[in-house]
UniProtKB/Swiss-Prot annotation:
It comes from Xenopus laevis. This is 4-hydroxy-2-oxoglutarate aldolase, mitochondrial. Belongs to the DapA family. The active site is at 193 (schiff-base intermediate with substrate). It catalyses: (4S)-4-hydroxy-2-oxoglutarate = glyoxylate + pyruvate; (4R)-4-hydroxy-2-oxoglutarate = glyoxylate + pyruvate. Keywords: Lyase, Mitochondrion, Schiff base, Transit peptide. Substrate binds at residues 74-75, 195, 219.
């Protein structure tokens, strides 16, 4: 990746983008700094979206100093929801939370046209920003050129700002650095959520784009401190669904330069974060939510609940790090 020649971005972009390139004088008006939980989607026993339990979760989350909410991200099981369900969840969240809470809605689809249509509809449903995951079904053909073309088309047609989303654990595809640098010059692409955890890569992207006001969010609480240390403006953290106050405290410590305290807190969040993401996934996240007073519940098929042994292991991880009593 790092040995690849970067696009001559300004020359390339001038022929791609419908609107003028972002410059030092045209920094984004919208800040996406802060902590965002990528909210889970509760389901009934019949695997229908439980909007009542969603509303209850949101009322509790509004007591935390989150900057906003990511709706229909990976933790929202968006891949298992219908088009109308995806839009209705956005509408319900917008209605339930204060206007100052930013709604970042996942509008990514596999085709460019479908992504544009979903983006427009999500904006109409109340999204302030859209989070667009990399298309990946034909990942072997998802070159930098293909991805720049895709995101440029989406951003040109989006009525709200666009945040790029790289999540290689789910897509098998890292949004290339050269593509990010090129796309950072589009006036309607304001940032990147990077869930890969490669701090060298994140630092390089920030170094190459910060003069444009491009904003990078860490995609996990597991490397939130590291992200802040290289210039990230915040994080989209699954663990914030469970330990919202603690993740926000870590943000505060980092922003205030209290690095020793931040390091100690970060250490206690690493294992729980890994447990509710890569190790046990959304079933683990929802189980932990239940323990901490939120509505997690079951997942939509084909995701299965944790086994009894997995539940014991998950609880042990939270216990040894001081978040649950034994």
């Amino acid at each position: 990746m790092f040995g690849r020649t970067l696009f001559p971005a300004r020359a390339l972009c001038s022929g791609l983008f419908k609107t003028p390139l972002r410059t030092l004088a045209t920094r984004p008006a919208l800040s996406i700094g802060g902590i965002y939980p990528p909210i889970a989607t509760p389901f009934t026993d019949k695997e229908e979206v439980d909007y009542g339990k969603l509303h209850e979760n949101l009322q509790k989350y509004c007591s935390f100093p989150f900057s906003g909410f990511v709706v229909q991200g990976s933790n929202g099981e968006y891949a298992y929801l219908t088009r109308e369900e995806r839009l209705e969840v956005v509408r319900r969240v917008r209605q339930a939370v204060p206007k100052e809470k930013l709604i970042m809605a996942g509008s990514g689809c596999e085709s460019t046209q479908a992504t544009i249509e979903m983006t427009v509809e999500m904006a109409r449903s109340g999204a302030d920003v859209v989070l667009v995951v990399t298309p990946s079904y034909y990942r072997g053909k998802m070159t930098s050129s293909a991805l720049v073309h895709h995101y440029t088309k989406v951003a040109d047609h989006s009525p709200v700002p666009v945040v790029l989303y790289s999540v290689p654990a789910n897509t098998g595809l890292d949004l290339p650095v050269d593509a990010v640098v090129t796309l950072s010059q589009h006036p309607n692409i304001i940032g990147l959520k990077d869930s890969g955890g490669d701090i060298t890569r994140i630092g390089l992207i920030i170094h190459k784009t910060k003069h444009l006001g491009f904003q990078v969010l860490s995609g996990s609480a597991g490397f939130l401190l590291a992200g802040y240390s290289v210039g990230a403006v915040g994080g989209v953290c699954a663990l914030a669904n469970v330990l919202g106050a603690q993740v926000c405290e870590l943000e505060k410590l980092c922003l205030n330069g209290r690095w020793q305290e931040a390091k100690e807190l970060q250490h206690r969040l690493i294992e729980p974060n890994s447990a509710v993401t890569r190790k046990f996934g959304i079933p683990g996240l929802k189980q932990a939510m239940d323990w901490f007073g939120f509505n997690g519940g079951k997942c939509r098929s084909p995701l299965l609940p944790l086994t009894e042994q997995e539940i014991k292991e998950l609880r042990h991880i939270f216990t040894v790090n001081g978040w649950l009593s034994s």
